[in-house]
Curated annotation (Swiss-Prot):
Protein name, UniProt field: 3-hydroxy-3-methylglutaryl-coenzyme A reductase
Cellular compartment(s): Endoplasmic reticulum membrane; Peroxisome membrane
Gene transcribed to yield this protein: HMGCR
Enzyme Commission numbers on file: 1.1.1.34
Lumenal topological intervals: 40-56, 115-123, 188-191, 276-314
Quaternary structure (record): Homotetramer. Homodimer. Interacts (via its SSD) with INSIG1; the interaction, accelerated by sterols, leads to the recruitment of HMGCR to AMFR/gp78 for its ubiquitination by the sterol-mediated ERAD pathway. Interacts with UBIAD1.
Annotated family: Belongs to the HMG-CoA reductase family.
PANTHER family: 3-HYDROXY-3-METHYLGLUTARYL-COENZYME A REDUCTASE
Upper lineage: Eukaryota, Metazoa, Chordata, Craniata, Vertebrata
Activity: how regulated: Regulated by a negative feedback mechanism through sterols and non-sterol metabolites derived from mevalonate. Phosphorylation at Ser-872 down-regulates the catalytic activity.
Length: 888
């Protein structure tokens, strides 16, 4: 329950960073300004003479205070030094923001408490720095930095708050209670220090729960690079911090802290309210005196300078202890900024040969890899295959990683391209770094697990054999290889090695590529247990003249003649003046099934849903789940006591299955409140209907309902399509209409609509399985024109399930195809327009393909063309199949 509250809080703060940051800063400034305008106007040294203040300055406490300041600075320095070892400049920057703003909030609180007296702030800041803990801030930053997208940043921050929030809250409570005991000691200096300590803990907690997560979310949102596959701040080796098992607090420790807190609360209650209430007032008075606020010993004087000049002079004039403190801070800052990075790299290079000078290579043919041009870096010469000095940052490069190589020279290391243990291309790199080879034999699992869990080392210090050994021992789940390796590609490579040993032919994966692919866009979105990617030829047809525009349409297919035939249809349409299209309806559907005790009860629910009041209730719940989803109508059917409710909603530019499922689930929960006896059997009851032939999609529509038409002049029919209008109409009636009816087809009143739909779907990142419903099409042909020699053709497709955001449309090759059509991503001006435009293009392309295919059938050219263009010229006798090999 507590974790859920912190998760909701974290999600809210991360989703509204500007509001939280502005609100937090405004609240802090208001507290300071309110104190300035309404508080006491006494300022020691400016308009008041404070003898007690002078006495404190001359006391021997200066030495202790100076030592405390130096220790605080050293403590902060070592914390940032540890953070640098993590290898992320974003963690350093975010931790710096946390420190600065926490100090600002703490200073504001102290100034407010001291009634504008800045001398006490000088004493309080060292105690604040000693109590600040950057480990929790960096832990939350790791959660965010391990994300692949901005939406995942918010989810991971919420998850981090759910894990870290309760622990941090309990720790802050315990610290305040423990430190607060010192405020009851009666020792003036101890009371002051403990008071400052409690303020420090509360200021840190306030910033961690409000400003910090909002700042992390905003910084990462502003620093993302949308053109890159993986965000520039994404750290794959931090993925394991997302494992709740590694972050869950020790329950024994938590119980001890709670018992301690309860005991300390009793101590405070007994001391302050039960034992003797008068000492409390006395202590408060003494504290006020100790802070230099006693009005009886202060004399009012006339200010000699303005207030800002007074503060400026105090800042410029420094005592010896301030000079010592400032000198130490500047010295450590210079060391950290200018020297620490070099020391860190030097230290890591002795531990890890991978961190020695890295050479990058652009992917080139194998023949080019034999050249050995020289690249000079850090006054050393290296062999590389890349000669272009001004290579753009946006171009794809691959890091060349060292592998263990047997060589006579201790200063030569073998490098290979890629993550496979069977390299295709190798280079030799001259280096002066001492060679530290990984052991040839795999180390014990315990040692490998320690290296894997070390933030400074990680998986890159383990060989592939050691990773495989950990997977076989169940220490690493095979499905998490990408997230645990230093690169996703290495995880895929290791999975291929694991799989190859289990296949009938170990070399089966030889021709399935896996390198140079952006797997960060695949994980968690498109595919699991990845072993590579499938290259499919992509052809282009066009121009497709549609609605006054010209489109070059990409089609991914392995069927010969398909692209050529569709291209001929596009040419015929363009010569006829182009095609026109309209979107008749736009609404994705989801059809859950619910059950009630009796059929009469189901009838009552159906009747209530069909009333305006019932629909309004369900629509309000449904629409609350998304800014795009808007419930349009409900189509309800009964089967006994089962009730099938078909929700239909617009989903913007997304195909919308996830969006509408979320809204459906919320609507069913609201419906359950009105009918508690209702049982929700499944959020999908096959009444949608998704990826199955269904008359409901053909009749009611699903996704986009599109119609497209064109008139082809008789001359074009004769010269381009090589047939006549009469012959095409005759074939269309007897094949597409009568023939499909004889076969009992549902939505299949076309020649080959599924061919064109599927080819475009694969090229543009759609769900290829949805070609089942999306290919519903009726192709009609009529004679047109004054002499009835022109051909009028139309295609009506009632259920094109398509989108331009989400799923496979996030992959870069698929995005390239969408960009060819000008519909990539979401339409900012009119949400949903890109998806509707893509649906019109699909329908227009289907019509072009239908036109050419029907012409080939009418002219008798189909078999001839396929025998020429759709048969492989490779001598099949030279290829050994699996069965042939076994038989031999």
């Amino acid at each position: 329950m507590l974790s859920r509250l912190f998760r909701m809080h974290g999600l809210f703060v991360a989703s509204h960073p500007w509001e939280v940051i502005v609100g937090t800063v405004t609240l802090t400034i208001c507290m300071m300004s309110m104190n300035m305008f309404t508080g006491n106007d006494k300022i020691c040294g400016w308009n008041y003479e404070c003898p007690k203040f002078e006495e404190d300055v001359l006391s021997s406490d200066i030495i202790i205070l100076t030592i405390t300041r130096c220790i605080a600075i050293l403590y902060i320095y070592f914390q940032f030094q540890n953070l640098r070892q993590l290898g992320s400049k974003y963690i350093l920057g975010i931790a710096g923001l946390f420190t600065i703003f926490s100090s600002f909030v703490f200073s504001t609180v102290v100034i407010h408490f001291l009634d504008k007296e800045l001398t006490g702030l000088n004493e309080a800041l060292p105690f604040f720095l000693l109590l600040i803990d950057l480990s929790r801030a960096s832990a939350l930053a790791k959660f965010a930095l391990s994300s692949n997208s901005q939406d995942e940043v918010r989810e991971n921050i919420a998850r981090g708050m759910a894990i870290l929030g309760p622990t941090f809250t309990l720790d802050a409570l315990v610290e305040c209670l423990v430190i607060g005991v010192g405020t009851m000691s009666g020792v003036r200096q101890l009371e002051i220090m403990c008071c400052f300590g409690c303020m420090s803990v509360l200021a840190n907690y306030f910033v961690f729960m409000t400003f910090f997560p909002a700042c992390v979310s905003l910084v990462l949102e502003l620093s993302r690079e949308s053109r890159e596959g993986r965000p520039i701040w994404q750290l794959s080796h931090f993925a394991r911090v997302l494992e709740e098992e590694e972050n869950k607090p020790n329950p024994v420790t938590q119980r001890v802290k709670m018992i301690m807190s309860l005991g300390l609360v009793l101590v405070h209650a007994h001391s302050r309210w039960i034992a003797d209430p008068s000492p409390q007032n006395s202590t408060a008075d003494n504290s006020k005196v100790s802070l230099g606020l006693d009005e009886n010993v202060s004399k009012r004087i006339e200010p000699s300078v303005s207030l800002w000049q007074f503060y400026l002079s105090k800042m410029i004039s420094m005592d010896i202890e301030q000079v010592i403190t400032l000198s130490l801070a500047l010295l450590l800052a210079v060391k950290y900024i200018f020297f620490e990075q070099a020391e860190t790299e030097s230290t890591l290079s002795l531990k890890n040969p991978i961190t020695s000078p890295v050479v990058t290579q652009k992917k080139v043919p194998d023949s080019c890899c034999r050249r050995e041009p020289v690249v000079v870096r850090n006054n050393q010469k290296f062999c590389s295959v890349e000669e272009e000095a001004g290579m753009s940052q946006d171009r794809k490069v691959e890091v060349i990683k060292p592998l263990v190589a047997e060589t006579d020279s201790p200063h030569r290391a073998a490098f290979v391209v890629g993550g496979s243990s069977f390299p295709d291309t190798s280079l030799v790199l001259e280096t002066k770094e001492p060679e530290i080879e990984l052991p040839k034999e795999p180390r014990p699992n315990e040692e490998c697990l320690q290296i894997l869990g070390n933030a400074e080392k990680g998986a890159k210090f383990l060989s592939d054999a050691e990773i495989i050994q950990l997977v076989n021992a169940k220490h690493i789940p095979a499905y998490k290889l990408e997230t645990l390796m230093e690169t996703h590609e290495r995880g895929v490579s290791i999975r291929r090695q694991l799989l190859s040993k289990k296949l009938p032919e170990p070399s089966s994966l030889q021709y399935l590529p896996y390198r140079d692919y952006n797997y960060s866009l695949v994980l968690g979105a498109c595919c699991e247990n990845v072993i590579g990617y499938m290259p499919i030829p992509v052809g282009v047809v066009g121009p497709l003249c549609l609605d006054g525009k010209e489109f070059q349409v990409p089609m991914a297919t392995t069927e010969g003649c398909l692209v050529a035939s569709t291209n001929r249809g596009c040419r015929a349409i363009c010569l006829g003046g182009g095609a026109s299209s309209r979107v008749l309806a736009d609404g994705m559907t989801r059809g859950p099934v619910v059950r009630l005790p009796r059929a009469c009860d189901s009838a009552e629910v159906k009747a209530w849903l069909e009333t305006p009041e019932g629909f309004a209730v369900i629509k309000e719940a449904f629409d609350s789940t998304s800014r795009f989803a808007r419930l349009q109508k409900l189509h309800i059917s009964m089967a006994g006591r089962n009730l099938y409710i078909r929700f239909q909603s617009r989903t913007g530019d997304a195909m919308g299955m996830n969006m509408i499922s979320k809204g459906t689930e919320k609507a069913l929960s609201k419906l359950h409140e009105y009918f508690p006896e209702m049982q929700i059997l499944a959020v999908s009851g096959n009444y949608c209907t998704d990826k199955k032939p269904a008359a409901v999609n053909w009749i009611e529509g699903r996704g986009k309902t599109v119609v497209c038409e064109a008139v082809i002049p008789a001359k074009v029919v004769r010269e381009v399509l090589k047939t006549t209008t009469e012959a095409m109409i005759d074939v269309n009636i007897n094949k597409n209409l009568v023939g499909s009816a004889m076969a009992g087809s549902i939505g299949g009143y076309n020649a080959h609509a599924a061919n064109y739909v599927t080819a475009i779907y694969i090229a543009c990142g759609q769900d290829a399985a949805q070609n089942v419903g999306s290919s519903n099409c009726i192709t009609l042909m009529e004679a047109s024109g004054p002499p009835n020699e022109d051909l009028y053709i139309s295609c009506t497709m009632p259920s094109i399930e398509i989108g331009t955001v989400g799923g496979g449309t996030n992959l870069l090759p698929q995005q390239a195809c969408l960009q060819m059509l000008g519909v990539q991503g979401a339409c900012k001006d009119s949400p949903g327009e890109n998806a509707r435009q893509l649906a019109r293009i699909v329908c227009g392309t289907v019509m072009a393909g239908e036109l050419s295919l029907m012409a080939a059938l009418a002219a008798g050219h189909l078999v001839k063309s396929h025998m020429i263009h759709n048969r492989s010229k490779i001598n099949l006798q030279d290829l050994e199949g699996a069965c042939t090999k076994k038989a031999a």
